[in-house]
Amino acid sequence: MTAALDPAGIPVLPRGVRLHHDRVRGVEVLLGPERTLMLDGIGHAILSEVDGARSVAAISDDLAARFGAPRDRVGADVSEFLGDLAEKRLLDLQDG
């Protein structure tokens, strides 16, 4: 079980980790050192909002508004997804 992320924390992709479009498979992937994580549409939507400036809460607010979804549900999903990536060392969380 992933620990809840601080909503004020600012997610950033660490050095050597980046979003990439895999043209062969036609999917978005997260590339990290010696690993690749294929993303579904939701994962890509979340990671495309990670800019190193906005907090987890701000990203959740923007996604909830964009997709017309309940803020509490989106916030929980964003926190869980980013927390999983942080546990895998594919994401860092800076103090907000």
Predicted regions mapped to residue ranges:
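Long, charge-rich, low-complexity alpha-helical segments
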Residues: 35-96
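Acidic, low-complexity/disordered tracts enriched in E/D and polar residues
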Residues: 1-48, 94-95
